[in-house]
């Protein structure tokens, strides 16, 4: 194993028995041959479970929607990319020449995906408990800074954070109708989310309120919230 990968292992706090697993986790799809997408898929599932389980234990009084919002914040691409930068992960990625020239080693989505792939690789190389220990160790500061007060955000913010955690496009809001007299108007808004086949709708005495109602409806349609949170 090269000295550089040895340094990365020290930063991660884990030494791979199978070096090929580590290399595969660091291989972007732009690189020739096999890539890290399958390991990323596995790592994403493990990450969501481990974080969800930890939140369930840490906040016994939290409602489902609150737990979902906290988890979305911890597993979103921005958080994972920040951790990856702390490991200097971009220095170890295997990228195709085009991606390399365009600065792919700094791109948030590539860094976040690679970290998820490393989680999947650690699970494959060791076991679930080892993967859990690494995830919780990496996220110690993030967990320590969490409170249920953090979940008191408006629906538009919660929807945006959820979509960002899934590396999805941000929602689009459109005023489709305005009814009533100028002093007593009702705004009708549609919210388009790429994960939903149908636009969610909201109405209110202002555009802002109508957008919040539409965002809340989208969160329910996505299964993130149940309407009672």
UniProtKB/Swiss-Prot annotation:
All copies of domain DRBM, residue ranges: 154-224
Cofactor(s) recorded in Swiss-Prot or TrEMBL: Mg(2+)
Catalytic activity as recorded in UniProt: Endonucleolytic cleavage to 5'-phosphomonoester
PROSITE patterns: DS_RBD, RNASE_3_1, RNASE_3_2
Catalytic residue positions: 44, 116
Domain of life: Bacteria
EC number: 3.1.26.3
One Gene Ontology biological process: tRNA processing
Major localization class: cytoplasm
Oligomeric and partner information: Homodimer.
Family: Belongs to the ribonuclease III family.
Functional summary from the UniProt entry: Digests double-stranded RNA. Involved in the processing of primary rRNA transcript to yield the immediate precursors to the large and small rRNAs (23S and 16S). Processes some mRNAs, and tRNAs when they are encoded in the rRNA operon. Processes pre-crRNA and tracrRNA of type II CRISPR loci if present in the organism.
Protein name: Ribonuclease 3
Protein species of origin: Pseudomonas entomophila (strain L48)
Gene expressing this chain: rnc
């Amino acid at each position: 194993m090269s000295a550089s990968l040895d340094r990365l292992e020290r930063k991660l706090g884990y030494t791979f028995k199978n070096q090929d697993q580590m290399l595969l986790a660091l291989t972007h799809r732009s690189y020739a041959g096999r890539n890290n997408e399958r390991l990323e898929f596995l790592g994403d599932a493990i990450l969501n479970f481990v974080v969800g389980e930890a939140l369930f234990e840490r906040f016994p009084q939290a409602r489902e929607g609150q737990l979902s919002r906290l988890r979305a914040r911890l597993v979103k691409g921005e958080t994972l990319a920040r951790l990856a930068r702390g490991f200097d992960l971009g220095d170890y990625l295997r990228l195709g020449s085009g991606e390399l020239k365009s600065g792919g080693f700094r791109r948030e989505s590539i860094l976040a995906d690679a970290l998820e792939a490393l989680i999947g690789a650690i699970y494959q190389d060791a076991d679930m408990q080892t993967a859990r220990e690494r995830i919780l160790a990496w996220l110690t500061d993030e967990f320590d800074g969490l409170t249920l007060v953090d979940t008191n955000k408006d629906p538009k913010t919660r929807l945006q954070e959820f979509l960002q955690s899934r590396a999805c496009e941000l929602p689009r809001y459109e005023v489709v109708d305005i009814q009533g007299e100028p002093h007593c108007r009702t705004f009708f808004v549609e919210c388009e989310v790429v994960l939903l086949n149908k636009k969610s709708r909201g109405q209110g005495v202002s555009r802002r309120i109508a957008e919040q109602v539409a965002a809340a409806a989208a969160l329910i349609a996505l299964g993130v919230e149940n309407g009672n949170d």
